[in-house]
A protein has these predicted regions:
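A contiguous active-site-proximal alpha/beta segment in oxidoreductase catalytic domains
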Residues: 42-102
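Alpha-helical elements of Rossmann-like donor-binding domains used by nucleotide-donor carbohydrate transfer enzymes
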Residues: 2, 11, 23, 50, ...
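Short, Asp-centered acidic motifs that coordinate Mg2+ and/or phosphate
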Residues: 10-11, 91, 166
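Contiguous beta-strand/loop segments that form the cofactor/metal-binding neighborhood of enzyme cores
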Residues: 127-173
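Mid-domain beta-loop-alpha active-site segment that forms a flexible
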Residues: 65-72, 103-136
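Beta-loop-alpha module in the N-terminal Rossmann-like domain of NAD(P)-dependent dehydrogenases
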Residues: 1-52
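A short helix->loop->beta-strand "cap" motif at the edges of active sites that frequently abuts
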Residues: 31-33, 57-61, 163-165
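Short catalytic-loop micro-motif centered on adjacent basic/acidic residues
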Residues: 14, 35-38, 62-65, 141, ...
C-alpha cells in the first residue's frame, strides 16, 4: 500500500502469481499507477475488462509481459507472411508443451493459484496464433484434460473467424 501511495512511483511491475494479478493491478490503477503485468494479465476476461475501464477513465496504461512478439523467430515468421511468400494464411496450428514435475503443492497444479497449462503457457500460444488472424474469432471451442487438482494438464482450442481463418492450439504440461 505504501508503494501505491508514493507520488514518486509512476509504474508498477507485477510479477506475482497469476491469482493475485487482478487485485494488485486494480489497486495500482486506483492509485493512478501504470501497470506492467506478467502473463497471464488476469485469470479471466471480466477482471481485465474492469481494469481496462479504470485505465480509460484515468488515462493510464496497462501492458502484459508476453515477450514472444520481440523474439527473432516471430519477427522472421511475420516478415515471411507479410511478403506473401506463403500466400494467404488460412490456418495456424500451435502445439506447445513443457514438462512440470507433478507436485500437488506447486503453483502450476494449484487451482487456487490459477495453475494449469492455459494460464501458464497458453497465453503465448493464443497470442501467437491470434496475431495472424485478420479479425477476432466468432467461434471458440475448447476442451481440457484435468489433473487430479482440477487444473488443465492439457487443453485444446479451436478458433474460427468470418474470413474462415482457423487456429488450432494444443497445450500440455
Amino acid at each position: 500500500q505504501a508503494m501505491f501511495k508514493d507520488g514518486n512511483i509512476d509504474i508498477v511491475y507485477n510479477a506475482t502469481p497469476h491469482n493475485s494479478h487482478y487485485e494488485i493491478m486494480k489497486d495500482a490503477l486506483l492509485h493512478n499507477k501504470h501497470v506492467f503485468c506478467e502473463k497471464a494479465i488476469t485469470i479471466n476476461s471480466y477482471e481485465l475488462e474492469e481494469c481496462v475501464e479504470i485505465v480509460k477513465e484515468r488515462h493510464l496504461v496497462i501492458s502484459d509481459g508476453v515477450t514472444l512478439f520481440h523474439m527473432p523467430l516471430f519477427k522472421r515468421v511475420k516478415k515471411v507472411i507479410s511478403l506473401n511468400y506463403l500466400g494467404p494464411v488460412k490456418m495456424v496450428q500451435v502445439n506447445f508443451g513443457n514438462f512440470k514435475e507433478y507436485d500437488v503443492n506447486n503453483r502450476f497444479f494449484n487451482p487456487n493459484l490459477a495453475g494449469g497449462a492455459l494460464l501458464d503457457i497458453g497465453v503465448y500460444a493464443v497470442s501467437f496464433a491470434r496475431y495472424f488472424m485478420k479479425t477476432k474469432p466468432d467461434i471458440v471451442l475448447t476442451t481440457m484434460i484435468p489433473f487430479e487438482t482440477g487444473v488443465d494438464e492439457s487443453s485444446g482450442i479451436l478458433l474460427q473467424n468470418k474470413e474462415m481463418e482457423i487456429v488450432i492450439i494444443f497445450l500440455t504440461m
